[in-house]
Amino acid sequence: MKFLPEVPPREFTTGVNNNVTIKDCGCMTLMPDEQITLETETGYELDVTRKNWGFYATPSLNKRLISFDLHGVLVRNVQGHYFVLLVETLKRSEFDKYAQEQNLELILWLDDGVGLDKQFLRAGER
C-alpha cells in the first residue's frame, strides 16, 4: 500500500448548484489482495479491497455493511448518472435532505437481501 498526500488538499466544487466543496486529500495505491479500512470520527467503518480484477468497493451490502451501521442505496442524478451511496444509520435525515437538495432520485436501497432477490432474480433461481 502506498499513500501520497495532497498538501494542501485540492478543492473543487460539485453538486447540482456547485454548492458542495470537496477536498481531495491524496492518492492511495493498493496491490491485489490488499485492503484498507476507512473510518469516520464517530467510528463508522468501510473496507475497500483490491483484487487482481478490480475492487470490492464495499463489504456485503446486506450483511457486513449493515453491521457497520451503513446502508447502501442506488441513486440517479438529474444528468442520468447512477451512484451507490453509503448512508450512516443515524444520519438518514441528513441523507434525505442532501438527496432532495441535489435532486437525487432514490432507485433502490441495497441492504435488503430479500428485496434484492425479488428485484433481480427470476423465480426458481433463489
Where are these regions (language model features)?
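Feature targets compositionally biased, intrinsically disordered low-complexity regions
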Residues: 14, 25, 42, 71, ...
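Acidic, low-complexity, intrinsically disordered interaction modules
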Residues: 25-105
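Intrinsically disordered, low-structural-confidence terminal and linker regions
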Residues: 1-27
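A generic structural signal for solvent-exposed, polar alpha-helical segments
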Residues: 9, 18, 59-62, 88, ...
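Short, mixed-charge low-complexity intrinsically disordered segments
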Residues: 52-57, 100-126
